[in-house]
């Protein structure tokens, strides 16, 4: 019986970040499909774990030890990339044309030896390919949501919003650039409100009461879950070219059309992961 280990720095019961929320859906679906799927925080993974499992899905791995990373390179694993952990600072946006010097690239062999490096969008994948010269990069072109969240977004599509209002995400993370989004709204005398950090369903219900999302990140967003959520709720978006989602063909969709598309894409993403790491899934 094949055994699979899912590795991540944090899980959704610890941090409600976009990567963790995506991983929670992926992990749940893998457990519905495969016989044995366990999960461990990256800092707890030991060399003995590398021998105890047959397959590995590595999400965020900042806290994974060098010994374990080196050992995994002889194993069957994929990297489910949420940012750019081959860079010292994980941010290609600090370099001209997103091109770092060779001295700032780390973990290269860990990416080279993976069966696949799954990226969130074509934009994300192009940056990774350009910087690492890999031929194992796969663009997923989407994200994963639980059905409950899709249902809430469907509900918010029907919400009567009235006058034009602008949403700004209140984030303590500097590169999310809340301050510039506020300045943009105030300079144009737009009616805006701050959407505060909160649990996902409440966040969606709050965000969905506005007509437009203003999101102006300073760094490349591999996809931007919140921008896609806004589009799925029928909202307009004011963003920058740093958003991975806006470069996808499906970004012209919005509302129920985009929700239906993302539901289908979610199934395709999960199937893609299974096909690549398990070939035809667990036999």
Where are the predicted features?
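N-terminal pre-catalytic "stem/leader" segment of glycosyltransferase-like enzymes
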Residues: 1-64, 238-283
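Glycosyltransferases and closely related glycan-assembly transferases
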Residues: 31, 49-55, 65-78, 90-92, ...
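Membrane-proximal helix-turn-helix segments that form the acceptor-binding/catalytic region
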Residues: 96-117, 126, 208
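Conserved catalytic-core segment of nucleotide-activated headgroup transferases in glycan assembly
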Residues: 144-206
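Conserved donor-binding/catalytic loop of nucleotide-activated donor transferases
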Residues: 208-210, 229-236, 240
């Amino acid at each position: 019986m094949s055994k699979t280990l899912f590795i991540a720095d944090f899980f959704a019961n610890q941090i409600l970040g976009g990567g963790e929320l995506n991983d929670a859906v992926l992990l749940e679906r893998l457990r519905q499909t495969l016989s044995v799927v366990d999960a461990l925080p990256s800092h707890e993974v030991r060399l003995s774990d590398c021998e105890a499992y047959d397959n590995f899905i590595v999400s965020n791995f900042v806290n994974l030890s060098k010994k374990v990373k080196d050992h995994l390179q002889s194993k069957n694993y994929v990297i489910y990339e949420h940012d750019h952990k081959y860079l010292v600072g994980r941010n290609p946006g600090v370099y001209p044309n997103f091109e770092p010097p060779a001295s700032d690239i780390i973990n290269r062999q860990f990416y080279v030896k993976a069966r696949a490096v799954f990226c969130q969008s074509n934009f994300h994948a192009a940056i990774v390919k350009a910087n690492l010269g890999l031929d194992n990069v796969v663009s997923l072109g989407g994200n994963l949501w639980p059905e409950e969240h899709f249902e809430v977004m469907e509900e918010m599509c029907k919400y009567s919003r009235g006058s034009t209002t602008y949403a700004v995400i209140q984030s303590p993370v500097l590169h999310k650039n809340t301050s510039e989004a506020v300045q943009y709204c105030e300079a144009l005398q737009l009616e805006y409100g701050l959407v505060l950090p909160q649990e996902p369903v409440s966040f969606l219900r709050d965000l969905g009461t506005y007509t437009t999302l203003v999101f102006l990140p300073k760094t490349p967003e591999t996809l931007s879950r919140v921008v896609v959520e806004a589009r799925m709720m029928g909202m307009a978006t004011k963003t920058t070219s740093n958003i991975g989602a806006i470069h996808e063909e499906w970004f012209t969709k919005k509302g129920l059309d985009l929700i239906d598309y993302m539901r289908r894409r979610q199934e395709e993403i999960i199937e893609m992961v299974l096909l690549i790491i398990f070939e035809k899934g667990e036999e």
